[in-house]
From Swiss-Prot:
This is Monomethylxanthine methyltransferase 2. The gene is MXMT2. Theobromine binds at residues 157, 160-161, 368. Mg(2+) binds at residues 178, 262-263. GO terms for biological process: alkaloid metabolic process; methylation.
Length: 384
C-alpha cells in the first residue's frame, strides 16, 4: 500500500476520529502571538495586490473542526493587524487554500463551512464572500501553486512528517536496524538517527525550495513542528507508542519481526538542525526561531469555539487524562499503524498506551517540545 494512502488522520466523527479528539489546545494558542507578528510584518512589506486579496495556504491542514480554528486565527490576525496598521475601512478579501494529502477527510471540513462563515460574519464583521476557503490536495513536497502567487504559507504539526521512510534504513542497514522503536528515538543507533536526519534534510530542503518559488518576494512562512532538545528526558507521544508495541510483543500478541520491519516516516529535528537547513538552502531569512513545551493533555484547555468532547471528563485524575491522550494519539497514527500491524490489535495497543501515559502523568511529566520558525523570502537582486 502506498504511503500517501494511509498517511492521514482517522476519518469521520466516531470516538476515535481526529475530528472528535483534536482540539484547539494550549500549544496552538502559543502560536497565535507569533502568527500576529508574522502577519504584521507581511502587511508592512506591501506585497503585490495584498491590499485587495491576501492569499494564504495552510499546509498539512488535517481535518475536522480544528482545521477551521486555525483558519479563524489567521483571519482574526489579518483583520486585527490590518486595523492597527492601516485603519482601513475596506478589508481585503482573504483567499485561503487548505492543503493536505489526497486521502485527507476534506468533507468533514466542507460540512462546517456554512456555520463557520456565519460565525465569521457575526463576530468579525466579515461578510460572506470576503473570506474564500477552498482545498488544494496534494503533497506539500511538490508544487501546489503558481510562481509568485502567494503571500503567506502556514503549517502547524506537519513538516515533521517525511515524504518516505528513510531508504537507508532497510537498504543499507537491513531490516531490524531500528530495534525496539518505530522512529528515530533517543534509543536508536547513530546510523538510524543519521538516516532519518538525511531524509529530513532532503525533504525540508525540497519544501523550502519549492514553496519559495510560490511566494512573492518578501512573502512569509510560519512553521510549527515537534522538535527535540538535548536535555529533554521525558517520553514523547511516539515513545509511548514504542512502549505499548513492545508490551504486545512481550505478552506474545505481536511478533517481534512486525516491529522490526516498521519505521514511521516521522522525524523530530532540533532547532539547530532546522536553522542549518534553512541557511544552507538559502531562499529564506530567519526572522525568529523559538522552542516551547506543550503538555500531553494540553487539549483539555477549553476554547469557546470548540465544545469539549462528551466522552471525556475535562477535570479528573491521570487515568481520565491518559485516556484522552491515547485517543488523540490514536486519531493521528492509527491509519498507518493499522496498515502494518492490523486493525484487530489497535484497541489493545492504545489501551496499553493509556496505561503508560497515566504513569508518566502521575510523575508530573508528559511534555513534548515544539519549534516555531518565522521565515521571509529573500528578495531577488532585481527587487533590492
Amino acid at each position: 500500500m502506498e504511503l500517501q494512502e494511509v498517511l492521514h488522520m482517522n476519518e469521520g466523527e466516531g470516538d476515535t476520529s481526529y475530528a472528535k479528539n483534536a482540539s484547539y489546545n494550549l500549544a496552538l494558542a502559543k502560536v497565535k502571538p507569533f502568527l500576529e507578528q508574522c502577519i504584521r510584518e507581511l502587511l508592512r512589506a506591501n506585497l503585490p495586490n495584498i491590499n485587495k486579496c491576501i492569499k494564504v495556504a495552510d499546509l498539512g491542514c488535517a481535518s475536522g473542526p480544528n482545521t477551521l480554528l486555525t483558519v479563524r486565527d489567521i483571519v482574526q490576525s489579518i483583520d486585527k493587524v490590518g486595523q492597527e496598521e492601516k485603519n482601513e475601512l475596506e478589508r481585503p478579501t482573504i483567499q485561503i487554500f487548505l492543503n493536505d494529502l489526497f486521502q485527507n477527510d476534506f468533507n468533514s471540513v466542507f460540512k462546517l463551512l456554512p456555520s463557520f462563515y456565519r460565525k465569521l460574519e457575526k463576530e468579525n464583521g466579515r461578510k460572506i464572500g470576503s473570506c474564500l476557503i477552498s482545498a488544494m490536495p496534494g503533497s506539500f513536497y511538490g508544487r501546489l501553486f503558481p510562481e509568485e502567487s502567494m503571500h503567506f504559507l502556514h503549517s502547524c504539526y506537519s513538516v515533521h512528517w517525511l515524504s518516505q521512510v528513510p531508504s537507508g534504513l532497510v537498504i543499507e542497514l537491513g531490516i531490524g536496524a531500528n530495534k525496539g522503536s518505530i522512529y528515530s528515538s533517543k534509543a536508536s543507533r547513530p546510523p538510524v538517527q543519521k538516516a532519518y536526519l538525511d531524509q529530513f534534510t532532503k525533504d525540508f530542503t525540497t519544501f523550502l525550495r519549492i514553496h519559495s518559488k510560490e511566494l512573492f518576494s518578501r512573502g512569509r512562512m510560519l512553521l510549527t513542528c515537534i522538535c527535540k532538545v538535548d536535555e529533554y528526558d521525558e517520553p514523547n507521544p511516539l515513545d509511548l507508542l514504542d512502549m505499548a508495541i513492545n508490551d504486545l510483543i512481550v505478552e506474545g500478541h505481536l511478533e517481534e519481526e512486525k516491529l522490526a520491519s516498521f519505521n514511521l516516516p516521522f522525524f523530530t529535528p532540533s532547532a539547530e538542525e532546522v536553522k542549518c537547513i534553512v541557511e544552507e538552502e538559502g531562499s529564506f531569512e530567519i526572522l525568529y526561531l523559538e522552542t516551547f513545551k506543550a503538555h500531553y493533555d494540553a487539549g483539555f484547555s477549553i476554547d469557546d469555539d470548540y465544545p469539549v468532547r462528551s466522552h471525556f471528563q475535562v477535570y479528573g485524575d491521570e487515568h481520565i487524562k491518559a485516556e484522552y491522550v491515547a485517543s488523540l494519539i490514536r486519531s493521528v497514527y492509527e491509519p498507518i499503524l493499522a496498515s502494518h500491524f492490523g486493525e484487530a490489535i489497535m484497541p489493545d495497543l492504545f489501551h496499553r498506551l493509556a496505561k503508560h501515559a497515566a504513569k508518566v502523568l502521575h510523575l508530573g511529566k508528559g511534555c513534548y517540545n515544539n519549534l516555531i520558525i518565522s521565515l521571509a523570502k529573500k528578495p531577488e537582486k532585481s527587487d533590492v
